[in-house]
């Protein structure tokens, strides 16, 4: 049995999951190539959590869920796009993914939120100070860093290493070529390669090609997210699927000190899932079910809010501070969120309604815990209370739609093998996981499913490699 190192391209959660599973479970050595100067990709910034259906945490909170219900929610969100068998695998493997993170890396994942498009609360995060993406990525990367020091024959991590070519021979992977920060090229022999190189949300060139209407929108993506993996896989003959399906997240924070910046901090969906509402600056009123799917919330902001900057107001009650203290403290430190009384809100944001009318708007929303919301929101948490006054304190920030996630990419099968245009496995030893792949989310990704996709298909790639090597 060959034990040549598996080359893992990228150190977001998909790459970290694949690498950890390869070395910890199968004792297969890995060489990890990361084009950036640090580990984590976009995964390290994930702020809402990771989905799982039928988990121990859900049982603790008496939440009834099933992989089938999760799959149905995913299919509904996908709007006829994508590959249903990949969606089924995502849902069916979700409790195993949560269990793996808890058991292997001692993560608590003991809190839940219900995000847009989900039938129940299934997005997991841990109590404590760390955001979910940072916590999960840190745990997995720390394990690999330790192994790189203590067992260098098992784990090698190369940063500032951009993959520029893949060599094949007789229908199999044979080598990977990468370029270091000095521009020098190096070749690594490899029988197996796992592409975990992320999406293309930072690439104006690729956005112009696949979704030109989005080129001028700001993005939450890191500057490494330029679609290198998709281009290399396309060159090898991979079937690219749903490349025009690009998720615009409805809420990226507008920095009042740099309003026109093309990069935005994400205003996590959990801010709405745990109680935040959206107000239209033109009317001072709610205008959308904040927990419908991301594409619908985005369309509503773009349709009714100020056209010049697509701006909405994210308003959160004081009760939310208990659940999201660390998030809100960070956002306030960055001047993205303010803590104001309602009197101050009307003045500060020049709302066209009186303070009394704003109080009435928030109190009416709070009453939907006992009656139906005309806008259709069914999860009313951490509302503003039954006695809203001009001195009621809220947390508020300005938000705008942002390019966030590319659903399209190289088509894979349920074994995480890259598929060619003839519907067959493209090359022996070629795998993909995470945002570089396509078909898992269709036209719209559910919040909490990106981290899940990384764990499910990263681990699957490792399992497939191990099975091929038997």
Swiss-Prot record:
Cofactor note: Binds 1 FAD per monomer.
Compartment list: Cytoplasm
Reactions mediated catalytically: succinate + NAD(+) = fumarate + NADH + H(+)
Residues where FAD binds: 6-20
InterPro entries, per database record: FAD-dep_OxRdtase_2_FAD-bd, FAD-oxidoreductase_2, FAD/NAD-bd_sf, Flavocytochrome_c, Succ_DH/fumarate_Rdtase_cat_sf
Active site: 249, 272
Alphabetical GO biological process terms: cellular response to anoxia
Free-text description of this protein's post-translational modifications in UniProt: The N-terminus is blocked.
Residues carrying Phosphoserine: 66
Domain of life the protein comes from: Eukaryota
Keyword NAD on entry: yes
GO molecular function: FMN binding; fumarate reductase (NADH) activity
EC number per UniProt: 1.3.1.6
Names of required cofactors: FAD
Major localisation: cytoplasm
Lipid biosynthesis as UniProt keyword: no
GO cellular component: cytoplasm; cytosol; mitochondrion; plasma membrane
Similarity field: Belongs to the FAD-dependent oxidoreductase 2 family. FRD/SDH subfamily.
NCBIfam families membership: flavo_cyto_c
Role description: Irreversibly catalyzes the reduction of fumarate to succinate. Together with the second isozyme of soluble fumarate reductase (OSM1), essential for anaerobic growth. Involved in maintaining redox balance. Reduction of fumarate is the main source of succinate during fermentation, and under anaerobic conditions, the formation of succinate is strictly required for the reoxidation of FADH(2).
Note: Present with 7620 molecules/cell in log phase SD medium.
Protein's recorded name: Fumarate reductase 1
UniProt organism field: Saccharomyces cerevisiae (strain ATCC 204508 / S288c)
Taxonomic lineage from the root: Eukaryota, Fungi, Dikarya, Ascomycota, Saccharomycotina
């Amino acid at each position: 049995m060959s034990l040549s190192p598996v080359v893992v391209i990228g150190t977001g959660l998909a790459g970290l999951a694949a690498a950890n599973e390869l070395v910890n479970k199968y004792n297969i050595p890995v060489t990890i190539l990361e084009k950036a100067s640090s580990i984590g990709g976009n995964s390290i910034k994930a702020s809402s959590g990771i989905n799982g259906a039928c988990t121990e945490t859900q049982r603790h909170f008496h939440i009834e869920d099933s992989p089938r219900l999760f799959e149905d929610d995913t299919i509904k969100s996908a709007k006829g796009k994508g590959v249903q068998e990949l969606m089924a695998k995502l849902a069916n493997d979700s409790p195993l993914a949560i269990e793996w993170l808890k058991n292997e890396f001692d993560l608590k994942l003991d809190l839940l939120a219900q995000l847009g498009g989900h039938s129940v609360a299934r997005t997991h995060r841990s109590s404590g100070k760390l955001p979910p993406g940072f916590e999960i990525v840190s745990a997995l990367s720390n394990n690999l860093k330790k192994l790189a020091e203590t067992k260098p024959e098992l784990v090698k991590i190369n940063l500032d290493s951009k993959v520029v070519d893949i060599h094949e021979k007789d229908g199999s992977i044979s080598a990977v070529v990468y370029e270091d920060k000095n521009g020098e090229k190096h070749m690594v022999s490899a029988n197996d390669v796992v592409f975990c190189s992320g999406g293309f949300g930072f690439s104006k060139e690729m956005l112009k090609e696949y979704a030109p209407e989005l080129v001028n929108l700001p993005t939450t993506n890191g500057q490494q997210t330029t679609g290198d993996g998709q281009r290399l896989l396309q060159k090898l003959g991979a079937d690219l699927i749903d490349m025009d399906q690009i998720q615009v997240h409805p809420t990226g924070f507008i920095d009042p000190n740099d309003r026109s910046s093309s990069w935005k901090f994400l205003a996590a969906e959990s801010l709405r899932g745990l109680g935040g509402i959206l107000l239209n600056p033109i009317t001072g009123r709610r205008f959308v079910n904040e927990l419908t799917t991301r594409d619908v919330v985005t369309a509503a902001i773009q349709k009714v809010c100020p056209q010049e900057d697509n701006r909405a107001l994210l308003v959160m009650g004081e009760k939310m501070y208990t659940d999201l203290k660390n998030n809100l403290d960070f956002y306030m430190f960055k001047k993205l969120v303010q803590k104001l009384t309602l009197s101050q809100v009307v003045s500060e944001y020049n709302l066209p309604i009186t303070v009394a009318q704003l109080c009435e708007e928030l109190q009416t929303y709070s009453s939907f815990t006992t009656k139906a919301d005309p806008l259709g929101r069914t999860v009313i948490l951490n509302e503003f209370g039954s006695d809203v006054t001009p001195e009621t304190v809220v947390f508020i920030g300005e938000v705008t739609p942002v390019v966030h996630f590319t659903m399209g990419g190289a088509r894979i099968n349920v074994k995480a093998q890259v598929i060619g245009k003839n519907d067959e496995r493209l090359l022996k030893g070629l795998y993909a996981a995470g945002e570089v792949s396509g078909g898992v989310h269709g036209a719209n990704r559910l919040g909490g499913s990106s981290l899940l996709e990384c764990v499910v298909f990263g681990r699957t790639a490792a399992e497939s490699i191990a099975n091929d090597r038997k």
